[in-house]
Regions:
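Extreme N-terminal starter segment of soluble prokaryotic enzymes
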Residues: 1-3
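Acetyl-CoA-dependent GNAT
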Residues: 5-86, 97-99, 103, 135-138, ...
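Hydrophobic alpha-helical segments
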Residues: 21, 72, 94, 127-131, ...
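Conserved acetyl-CoA-binding loop-helix of GNAT-fold acetyltransferases
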Residues: 83, 89-102, 106, 124-129
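C-terminal "cap" of GNAT-fold acetyltransferases
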Residues: 110-113, 117-124, 129-158
Length: 158
């Protein structure tokens, strides 16, 4: 398995993979899927230019995707992690996360953050194994800094 940093030249591949991820996660009736289904090549290329997109290839088939962007000079935010249902449980998420974290290190980031659904035990386990910890809301000490069903987690890079 190999991680690929997608570039603007890969926009067709990215579009197909992203739409596959949305269809699997939310269904084709979802508003986000319908919106992105109508994206032009220019819109897909812009996404690849503005945020880092990493895909994982397994025997010539893309089986996972993660997005990352520099939230501030010292911070990277990861989002939209997806693995193909047929590839789950084979280390795809961990491999993609590691690539995105390494990208953050190369940028000089000292913190990586992400959000995860509170009931996604598989994802929580992977994040915790990689060293991510729940981020407390400084105002009330709760573990919720986003929507009620999501948990914000962070990883401190050395």
């Amino acid at each position: 398995m190999g991680v690929i940093r997608l570039t603007e030249a890969d926009w067709r591949l990215f579009a197909a993979l992203r739409l596959r991820a949305l269809a699997d996660s939310s269904g084709t009736d979802d508003a986000e899927y319908r919106t992105e289904m109508s994206f032009t090549g220019t819109q897909w290329r812009r996404r690849l230019r503005v945020h880092a997109q990493f895909a994982l290839a397994d025997e010539e088939r893309l089986v996972g995707l993660i997005a990352a962007h520099r939230a501030s000079p010292g911070s990277v935010y990861l989002y939209s992690l997806w693995t193909d249902p047929m590839a789950r449980g084979r280390g795809v998420a961990r491999t993609l996360l590691t690539a995105a974290i390494d990208w953050g290190r190369e940028l000089g980031a000292h913190t990586v953050t992400l959000r995860v659904h509170r009931n996604n035990a598989a994802a929580l386990g992977v994040y915790q194994d990689l060293g991510f910890v729940a981020t407390a809301n400084p105002a009330d000490g709760s573990q919720n800094t986003g929507p009620a069903d999501e948990l914000t987690m962070s990883l401190t890079l050395s």
